């Protein structure tokens, strides 16, 4: 355990200015980031008598091996830098307000000619407007189904829209008046966009105006004796009122605000946030954060309050709204939709309330108020959110108790069954997927403490063991194993070279051939040997290197041949501290290298259940990547081969000319009429389509090398139309140890 006095800065070297500091452990990892009005006062508090420090702070300073700081001009700048560093380094001793799931939102693709409404989970995209988040996807679908009779906008995918446009008939929603059927020209693009804009206005809270307009149209239709239209409008008004009933008014003044509440114990804190727009609750989200290893700057806590809640509130505000502003900025939403409301209601004000309020105002672009509700509707709503937070914490503790017990039992059972030195806290599993030797891919999934660590998942495109319609599953397992562990050995070699003062010619984490989420190769940069834990950290960033941590248990999906192949690779690389097993399907036998008979785990054991989940997750991940790779190959376009021609400009070309066949007949001058297409690009397009003989000066956009495009044959393209499936051949994709199909 490091002694804080060994890395304490010399007296007088710490400035008294405001700034941000970070503690690193002996391996260079950033473990805590904090800010202070006076760096000297704050940092000196960490180097007091260790026995007088709070237990969480004591754990942090005894884990750290060094401290660094950066001086800033203002406290608001310190707040921004602290947020950026926490986001970049993900320190283990900082509270991280991250959702434990991706909440569904209602997305409106305003960047398309015919905007689409759909339920969405995932990163924000430019030109798409989002409403939510919501707790359940079914709630969005129920409301959307109710509103489609009033706002019959498109909800189908691009493929469905194109198909019905080609056949000239609308889908079922078009026949039952829940879609205006722009695919068959029932409404124009401008009319359809007006419908979508009215829908967005309704969800944004501008409801009274829309209801009054419908009522006026209903009255006019009635006066004109058009009772059928009047009855339909009457039903539309009723549908809107039912939708409004689902969102009861909670703040009578039509306030736009977020209401946050916290429920804490000694180890964890539950956070609940209600998003109120136009006086109605439009969304809700909640999560639980760990406090067991989190440091609170007790010197900054009001001793009279005797609580760490103000610091938790400050960390929540900076992290949560920093992420929201970043997402809204990436989505290029309208002004005022930065994700930061005009008012944020919190249980207590943060210590630096004025600076936090100024920072939030900068994110929004207009004034933001931080308030503690004292009476009335806002106080009542805050109490409701607080009850939700307390209930969420209680439910989380109940689930965690049962889940932690079962995971501990599973890991201990695996250790005993396989006679391991310690419980396999990190398990990696590899699986192979292909269709009759084509599009051969592999997946590698990672479980830590019995839970999936999806940020460490990796894809591989098999190269050496596949090709020309052949596939050797055993050789594929060996290839993936070699590439995975060569990467680790290379990191060891890089660290040793850096320690020896090697120059920048050595391999780095980004050069050479690397494992990526697609299909990178591996090159060896190390000399094998036992795995060194210090190789796991990039000294430049303090963050873990990709694939740097070795597993305690390496699982292959298969039987004795696959296990023998993986074990032989590890022996070849000199790796001795990684256990290898194989899990065969059907009988669920656990194969160990060098053993003639498999290990049989009880069918009802938690250990077998954990291994099955790991294996099935690898199988799912491999098949997902295989399908994606196969789909890209089967829907390839001749334009894909034009270097420098991206997806946006490809779509612009096809939209302008109508098809690849017509594009092929166009001249260079006609192609350059498309915005963003220059002469060199136009020549490269015609060369790729085989419209003229390829020449050296049109090899690609901005490329002086010889032509690499060439005409695309029917074998690759399969059709003149871009990105149209050309058919599916062979049986469904199969895994290395399951030949019965993808599923």
From Swiss-Prot:
Pfam families assigned to the protein according to its UniProt record, in alphabetical order: GIY-YIG, HHH_5, UVR, UvrC_RNaseH, UvrC_RNaseH_dom
UniProt domain UVR: residue ranges: 208-243
Lineage: superkingdom: Bacteria
Segments of skewed composition (Polar residues): 734-743
GO CC annotations, alphabetized: cytoplasm; excinuclease repair complex
Subcellular location(s) of the protein: Cytoplasm
GO BP term, pick one: SOS response
InterPro entries recorded: GIY-YIG_endonuc, GIY-YIG_endonuc_sf, GIY-YIG_UvrC_Cho, Hlx-hairpin-Hlx_DNA-bd_motif, RuvA_2-like, UVR_dom, UVR_dom_sf, UvrABC_protein_C
GIY-YIG domain sequence ranges: 16-95
Primary residence: cytoplasm
Keywords: Cytoplasm, DNA damage, DNA excision, DNA repair, Excision nuclease, SOS response
Region entry Disordered, spans: 497-543, 694-743
Composition skew (Acidic residues), residue ranges: 506-520
GO molecular function list: DNA binding; excinuclease ABC activity
Protein family per UniProt: Belongs to the UvrC family.
Quaternary assembly: Interacts with UvrB in an incision complex.
Functional note: The UvrABC repair system catalyzes the recognition and processing of DNA lesions. UvrC both incises the 5' and 3' sides of the lesion. The N-terminal half is responsible for the 3' incision and the C-terminal half is responsible for the 5' incision.
UniProt protein name: UvrABC system protein C
Organism: Rhodococcus opacus (strain B4)
């Amino acid at each position: 355990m490091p002694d804080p006095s060994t890395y304490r800065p010399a007296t007088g070297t710490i400035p008294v200015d405001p700034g941000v500091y970070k503690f690193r452990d002996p391996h260079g990892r950033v473990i805590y980031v904090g800010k202070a009005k006076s760096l000297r006062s704050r940092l000196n508090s960490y180097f007091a008598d260790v026995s007088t420090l709070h237990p969480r702070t004591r754990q942090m300073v005894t884990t750290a091996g060094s401290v660094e700081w950066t001086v800033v001009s203002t406290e608001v700048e310190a707040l921004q830098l602290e947020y950026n560093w926490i986001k970049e380094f993900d320190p283990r001793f900082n509270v991280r307000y991250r959702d434990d799931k991706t909440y569904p939102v209602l997305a409106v693709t305003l960047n398309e000619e015919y905007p689409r409404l759909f339920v969405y989970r995932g990163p924000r995209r430019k030109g798409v407007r989002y409403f939510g988040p919501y707790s359940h996807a079914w709630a969005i679908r129920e409301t959307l189904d109710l509103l489609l009779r009033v706002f019959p906008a498109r909800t189908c995918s691009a493929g469905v829209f194109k198909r019905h446009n080609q056949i000239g008939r609308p889908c079922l929603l078009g026949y039952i008046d829940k879609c205006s059927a722009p695919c068959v020209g029932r409404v124009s693009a401008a009319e359809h966009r007006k419908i979508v804009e009215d829908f967005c206005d309704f969800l944004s809270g501008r409801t009274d105006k829309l209801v009054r307009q419908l009522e006026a149209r209903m009255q006019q239709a009635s006066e004109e004796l058009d009772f059928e239209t009047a009855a339909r409008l009457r039903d539309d008004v009723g549908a809107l009122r039912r939708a409004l009933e689902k969102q009861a008014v909670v703040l009578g003044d039509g306030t736009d605000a977020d209401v946050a509440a916290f429920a804490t114990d000694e180890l964890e804190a539950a956070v609940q946030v209600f998003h109120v727009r136009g006086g109605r609750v439009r969304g809700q989200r909640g999560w639980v954060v760990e406090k067991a290893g989190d440091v609170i700057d007790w010197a900054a806590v009001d001793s009279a309050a005797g609580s760490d809640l103000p610091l938790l509130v400050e960390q929540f505000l900076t992290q949560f709204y920093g992420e929201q502003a970043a997402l809204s900025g990436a989505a290029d939403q309208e002004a005022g939709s930065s994700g930061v409301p005009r008012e944020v209601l919190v249980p207590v004000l943060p210590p630096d309330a004025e600076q936090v309020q100024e920072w939030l105002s900068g994110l929004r672009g207009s004034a933001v108020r931080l308030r503690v509700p004292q009476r009335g509707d806002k106080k009542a709503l805050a109490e409701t959110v607080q009850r939700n937070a307390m209930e969420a914490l209680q439910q989380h503790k109940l689930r965690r108790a049962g889940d932690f017990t079962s995971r501990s039992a599973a890991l201990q059972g695996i250790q005993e069954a396989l006679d391991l030195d310690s419980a396999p806290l990190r398990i990696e599993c590899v699986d192979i997927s292909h269709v009759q030797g084509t599009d051969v891919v592999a997946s590698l999934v990672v479980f830590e403490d019995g839970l999936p660590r999806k940020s460490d998942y990796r894809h591989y495109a098999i190269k050496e063991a596949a090709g020309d319609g052949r596939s050797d599953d055993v050789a594929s397992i060996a290839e993936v194993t070699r590439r995975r562990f060569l990467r680790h050995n290379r990191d060891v070699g890089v660290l040793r070279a850096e320690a020896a003062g090697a120059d920048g010619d050595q391999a780095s984490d980004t050069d050479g051939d690397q494992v990526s989420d697609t299909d990178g190769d591996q090159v060896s940069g190390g000399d094998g040997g036992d795995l060194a834990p210090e190789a796991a950290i990039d000294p430049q960033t303090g963050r873990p290197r990709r694939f740097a941590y070795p597993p305690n248990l390496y699982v292959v999906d298969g039987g004795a041949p696959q296990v023998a192949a993986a074990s032989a690779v590890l022996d070849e690389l000199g790796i001795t501290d990684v256990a290898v097993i194989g899990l065969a399907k059907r009988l669920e036998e656990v194969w160990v290298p060098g053993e003639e008979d498999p290990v049989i785990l009880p069918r009802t054991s938690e250990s077998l259940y954990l291994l099955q989940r790991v294996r099935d997750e690898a199988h799912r991940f491999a098949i997902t990547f295989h399908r994606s790779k196969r789909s890209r190959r089967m829907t390839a376009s001749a334009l894909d081969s034009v270097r420098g021609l991206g997806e946006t400009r490809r779509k612009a070309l096809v939209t302008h000319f109508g098809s690849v066949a017509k594009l092929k007949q166009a001249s260079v001058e006609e192609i350059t009429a498309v915005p963003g297409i220059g002469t060199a690009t136009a020549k490269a397009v015609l060369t790729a389509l085989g419209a003229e003989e390829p020449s050296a000066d049109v090899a690609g956009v901005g490329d002086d090398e010889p032509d690499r495009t060439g005409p695309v044959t029917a074998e690759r393209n399969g059709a003149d139309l871009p990105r149209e499936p050309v058919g599916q051949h062979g049986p469904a994709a199969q895994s290395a140890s399951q030949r019965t199909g993808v599923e």
